[in-house]
Amino acid sequence: MSSEQKPVEDLTEEEAAAALAYLAAEIARNDALYHGNDAPEISDAEYDALKRRNDAIEARFPALVRADSPSRRVGAAPSETFMPVVHARPMLSLDNTFSQEDVQDFVAGVYRFLGRLPDQSIAFTAEPKIDGLSMSIRYENGRMVSAATRGDGTTGENVTANIRTIKEIPQTLPAGAPAVVEIRGEVYMAKSDFLALNAQMEAEGKQSYVNPRNTAAGSLRQLDAKVTASRKLKFFAYAWGEMSDMPADTQFGMVQAFGEWGFPVNPLMKRLNSVADILAHYDEIGLQRPDLDYDIDGVVYKVDSLELQARLGFRSRSPRWATAHKFPAEQALTRLLDIDIQVGRTGALTPVARLEPITVGGVVVTNATLHNADYIKGIGNKGEPIRDGRDIRIGDMVIVQRAGDVIPQIVDVVLEKREASSVAYEFPKTCPVCGSHAVRDINEKTGKVDAVTRCTGGFICRAQATEHLKHFVSRNAYDIEGLGSKQIDFFFESDDPALQVRTAPDIFTLERRQQSSLSKLENIDGFGKVSVSKLYAAINERRDIALHRFIFALGIRHVGETTAKLLARSYGTYEAFEAGMKEAAPLAGDAWNDLNNIEGVGEVVARAVVEFYKEPRNVEVISKLLDEVRPQEAEQPTTSGSPVVGKTVVFTGSLEKFTRDEAKAKAESLGAKVSGSVSKKTDIVVAGPGAGSKLDKAREFNVQVMTEDEWLELIGG
C-alpha cells in the first residue's frame, strides 16, 4: 500500500513526508484547474478528501508542514491574461465541515476560544454557499473603480470592464455610503439562463457547456466584455474587504446595508442562536435546494458580532469565526447511453458519459465525466482496481454521483443489470476532432504509461490550435511583439478569411491577405494604423529565425527550450532534422539510435518528436510555414580550449553582470550544458546573492561552487 493510500495513523515519518509532497502537488494542480482554468477534473468531495488527508497528516506530524502546504494557501495564482490586482485585504477561503458533529465542534471551538459558557449565547448567521466565482468590487467616493477575482487570495485578476456589464451590480453607491467600500460576493449564472444558453449552443451546432459555475467563470474571463454582457451573469453580496467606515457592527447588519445600497443579497440568510437552530436551517436550505435557480454546495455559518470576529481572528488561510457546512454527494441510478470523446486544449482526450436523463439533487443530469481510459476499465490512477475492477460499458445501469454541484461522475456499475450482449468499450486510437493518432505517453519520472490519451495532431487539431499558436509566438519561440494571447484569440475566432489565423503559416500571410481585402485590420477596435504597421514589421523581422527557436516553436510535446537547442546543435539544419525524424519513424535503426543517443534527449522525448512527424498534417503545416520563414543553420559552439566543454552548469541566485539568459547562452556557446536543477551529475554551480536550495544541494553533493566573478575568470570574461 502506497503512502497516499495508507491510513494516517499507520504512516511512518518518511511516508508522511512523501504523502505531504504528493498532496501539495495534487491539490495545487487541482486549485489551478478550478480557480485558474475553470475546468475541475475532480468533484468537490474528492478535493475535500485530499485536503482533509493533508490536514490530518500535518496534525500528526507538525514538523513536516511544507512551505507550499495547501493549509497555507488559498486558490490559485491569477492568470496572465488580465492585469493583476493586489487585494487591500486578503480574500481567504473557509474551512469545511461535513457532519453535525463537525458543526458542533466548530461552535464549541468558538465558545472555548472566547472563554464563553454555553449559556452565554453567541449569535451566528447561516446562508447558502453559492457555487460561483468569488469577486471583490471596490468603490471610491461612491463610484466603482475596480473589480478583481480571488486569484491566490492576495492577488487577483482585474475584470472591471466585465463586471460593469452585470446589471445587478450597481455602478454607483448612494450618498450615505462610506468613501471607500469593497464589496465581496459571488458571481454566478442562474440555472435557467444556463439551460437557455446550452439550448442556444446546441441549436447553433456548437458544443454545450458543462455546468453553470464553469460557464460563469469563463464568461467573466472573456476579453470581449460584450460576450460577458450576453451571458446574463448575476451576483450575491455577502462580505467586504477594505471599508473606510462600517455601517453596522454585525455580519447580519452589514449584509442588510449592502442590500440597501442596491446589491442583491441572499434572502435565505438568517441570524440564529443555537446549534440546533443552525442545523435546522441547514436542513431547510437543503430541502429548498432543488427549487433554487442557482447552484449551492453547502451552508456558511459566521459569528454575527464583528467585535467577536475580530477577537477570534484568523488561521493561516481561513477565519476562526466562519465555516462552510458542505452538502453530501448525491447519487442516482440511470442507464449509460453512449460515450463521447472531448478534446481539451492540451490534446487530452476525455470520455464523457451520455446518460438517460435522471434527476440528482433536483437537477436533471444527462452527462457525467469518465476521466480517462483506465477509469472506464476499472483501474485507478496508480494502477489499483476501482469499483472492484468492474469496467463501464455502453448500455450499463450506472450509479451517478453529483457532489458539490460540480460535473457529475459515474461511481459504479450494477453488474446484475448488464445485458449479456454488452461488449467492453474500446477507447479511440485517433482524435475525434482532427483524425490524428491518439497515444498514451510514458511518464518520464515513473516510467509508466500515462492515464491520459493525447492527440498528436498539434497545429492541425482545432481543439489545441489556439494554445499552440500562443506557444508559437511566445518569448522563447518566435517572440513576435504585438501578437499576444488576446490578439491570437481575436484572429483565431474571426470569420473573415482576410483576418483568420488558424495555423502558424497564417501569421506570415496576414499582411498579404489584408492588402487585397476591404475589411482592414486597422479599422477594428483595439488595433489602429500605427499598431498594425508595427505588428507587420514584427512579423517580418521573424522570417529569419534560429533553428532552436523554430523547433521549440513547433510545440512538440516534451521538447522544451533546452531540448530544442540540443536537437538543433545535433542536426545543424532543419532539413537534416526533419529527415532524421522521418527516418526514425520505425523506432529502430541508425536514425532512431542517433536521436536516442543525443545526451539530454532520451526515449520519451525521442518518441514524442518522431510521433509528431509521423502525423502527415503536421508535416503539411510545417511545409507551408517553410514557404514563409527561413530557419537558420545552428551555430556550433566554439569550444576549442574551453574549460567548461561537456560540463553541466547551474546558475542560481542573482547575477549582476549578466541576465540569466545571457549567462546561459554564453555557457552553451562554450560547450557547457546548462541545467535548471542540481544533481550528482552537476559539475559547477554559479551562485549569486539570494541563492537558496540549489546552493544547499550543491554542497550536499560536493559540487564545485563559484561566484559570478570566479565563473567569469574561468571562462575568460
Curated annotation (Swiss-Prot):
Belongs to the NAD-dependent DNA ligase family. LigA subfamily. Keywords: DNA damage, DNA repair, DNA replication, Ligase, Magnesium, Manganese, Metal-binding, NAD, Zinc. Zn(2+) binds at C431, C434, C455, C461. The active site is at K129 (n6-amp-lysine intermediate). It comes from Rhizobium rhizogenes (strain K84 / ATCC BAA-868). It holds the Pfam family HHH_2. The lineage of its organism: Bacteria, Pseudomonadati, Pseudomonadota, Alphaproteobacteria, Hyphomicrobiales. This is DNA ligase. Its EC number is 6.5.1.2. Its cofactor is Mg(2+); Mn(2+). DNA ligase that catalyzes the formation of phosphodiester linkages between 5'-phosphoryl and 3'-hydroxyl groups in double-stranded DNA using NAD as a coenzyme and as the energy source for the reaction. It is essential for DNA replication and repair of damaged DNA. Coiled coil: none annotated. NAD(+) binds at D44, A45, E46, Y47, D48, S93, L94, E127, R150, E186, K302, K326. CDD domains: BRCT_DNA_ligase_like, LIGANc.
